Design a protein with these regions (language model features):
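Short, Lys/Arg-enriched, disordered terminal segments
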Residues: 1-10, 194
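N-terminal basic/disordered segments at the start of proteins
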Residues: 7-38
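Helical "lid/coupling" subdomains associated with nucleotide-phosphate turnover
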Residues: 11, 25, 52-83, 91-141, ...
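Short aromatic-hydrophobic micro-motifs that form the base-stacking/packing surface
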Residues: 12-14, 87, 143-145
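A short acidic Gly-Thr/Ser loop motif
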Residues: 15-20, 145-151, 207-210
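Conserved ATP-binding subdomain of kinase catalytic cores across diverse folds
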Residues: 34-53, 69, 79
Length: 291
């Protein structure tokens, strides 16, 4: 390719989470030796696989059929957008489902879409690798926290360098199903308390649809730096928790699949913030599918 020529290529990522399944298509424009990324399409479908898995241990036949239908739809969309390469990743619900591997084989057979079931560590690292380029200020200590439906991924950064990646089976859908073990909460609290001793004055970088929504709902925030104080999140969480599901939907324009999980999401972020003594949360609006 000539140095002055522009080449455009579309790539896709599919994120099969415990609450929703997402398709993200991005265009990569290569110009004068530099790559520029732009979002072409983003679709979110609340399949809510975790409500089956964290209750009965497997994905129901109905949701399996819907998964296959959805992957067929995604495949057609990728053809329309002339996608050259796609990576599909399944996380916590598929990891835990007894029939997860069987469903993935069926999906590939019927749709041609290959799905990788990734572990929590890889999930955390994909999110981290995507995040690095979004952060202008890499000085100090940050804990990158991605709260999903089935698990919470944590990356600790110090002076822009990755210190460690951790994954915990604590997620919003798990909490709604009362499926989080006390031992998992203890593991998270003990781990973070130890990290806080070695890395004081750590603040949070929040990832996931719930923290994005909470940030948008917050009355007081720094729009330029995309941050909100933990105290502001606490006030908002208290206000939302006092409302019924229907009231949250009516007063804040939430969809049903957001109005229920936003409460446990707030609890997870606040628990982590209190353990490490964070004063604010930075919300860059990126997640697994962006990586």
């Amino acid at each position: 390719m000539n140095e002055n020529e522009t080449r455009k290529t579309n790539y896709a990522a599919i994120d099969i989470g415990s609450n929703a399944v997402r398709l993200l298509i991005k265009e990569i424009k290569e110009e004068q030796g530099k790559a520029h990324f732009s979002k072409v399409l983003m679709l979110r479908v609340p399949l809510r696989l975790g409500f089956d898995v964290f209750d009965i241990g497997k994905i129901s036949e109905k949701k399996e059929k819907n998964m296959i239908r959805l992957m067929k739809a995604f495949r057609h969309l990728m053809k329309i957008y002339d996608v050259k390469h796609c990576r599909a990743c399944a996380t916590s619900a598929m990891r835990d489902a007894k029939n997860g591997m069987d469903i993935i084989k069926q999906i590939e057979k019927k749709t041609g879409v290959h799905i990788d079931i990734i572990d929590g560590q890889e999930e955390a690292k994909i999110i981290y690798n995507n995040h690095v380029e979004h952060m202008e200020d890499q000085k100090g200590n940050y804990m990158y926290v991605d709260v999903g439906g089935g698990s919470t991924e944590i990356n600790l950064l110090s002076e822009g360098q990755l210190v460690c990646s951790r994954s915990y089976n604590i997620g919003t859908v798990r909490m709604l199903n009362n499926a989080v073990k006390d031992s998992e909460w203890e593991r998270l609290k003990n781990d973070l308390a130890e990290l806080a001793k070695s890395y004081p004055q750590t603040n949070i970088i929040g990832s996931g649809g719930n923290i994005n929504k909470l940030y948008r709902l917050a009355d007081k925030k720094n729009k330029k730096k995309m941050t909100m104080q933990v105290s502001v999140l606490q006030e908002l969480h208290t206000r939302l928790k006092a409302l019924s599901l229907e009231e949250r939907m009516e007063q804040f324009g939430m969809k049903p699949d957001r109005a229920d999980v936003i409460i446990p999401a707030g609890e997870i972020f606040l628990t982590i913030a209190n353990i490490i003594g964070a004063s604010y949360i930075h919300v860059p609006v990126i997640g697994l599918s962006d990586g």
